[in-house]
Amino acid sequence: GRVVDAAPDAHPLALSLPQRLAGKEVLAIPDPEGDEHGPGTYTYPKDNAFAPFQGLFDLLEMRILDSGATWTFVFPFKEMTNPWGAPAGFSHQLLNVYLDFKDGGRTDPFAKGAKVAFDPEHPWDLFLKAAGWPQYGQRVGFPDGTDTADGITVGSNPADKQVIVQLDKKHFNPASGQRVCFYVLVGSQDGYGPDHFRPVAKEAGPWNLGGAENEDAPLVVDYLWPEKGVQEAMLSRYGGGRHAVLKPYCVAWP
């Protein structure tokens, strides 16, 4: 048979087992429930693989735990299913996390896919990509265009509907009080889509989302921001060859 995927040698079993959360919570940023509609218009694909047709892309918050040598990022969703048998335990969620914590960086995405741009005041310094298939969904990216699977582990706790990302502190270890800004994008994972984002068209089909006004529409279904309406306002400013420009959510590191 054809080898569809292989787990990393170092942790061959860690992916399929629910990950226990260990560490002290240092940060929690909530996201409104029921806003998995991108700019406010997006609808689910029609194939039964997307049942229950709600909640699969609905990010509820981002928590960060201090786990010693690593940070543990926890992303709970309203729903989590695995109809396609993804090794990491979740089929649908695609997370792109961009961190701005120092000078310099980039204002375009790591790879062409999401159809967004980033605030010129907050260029990103580190990119985390999480999806259910480790060969492309367990990556750390850098502004120079290089990326690695070293120092990142992506798993899940399906019982609690959580995507769990462990990041080695060698990649990111801010000082207390340091300003850290987060761009947290949720897409619909598509193994054949641009940078594994599922396309959005005017009308939903079996395998594409609906609700786009034109081909410049962002492929972002949910975006981390605590206040209602901010995500929709940001993501709806596209068209005429221009992509939506995202602003990051910034905190003083505890």
What are these regions (language model features)?
Residues P12-V26, Y44-A131, G193, C250:
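Surface-exposed, glycine/proline- and aromatic-rich loop segments on solvent-exposed faces
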Residues R63-T70, T153-K161:
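Short, ordered beta-strand-loop transition motifs
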Residues F75-T81, D144, L167-H171:
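Secondary-structure transition/turn motif
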Residues N157-S176:
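Localized edge beta-strand/strand-to-loop motifs within extracellular or lumenal beta-rich domains
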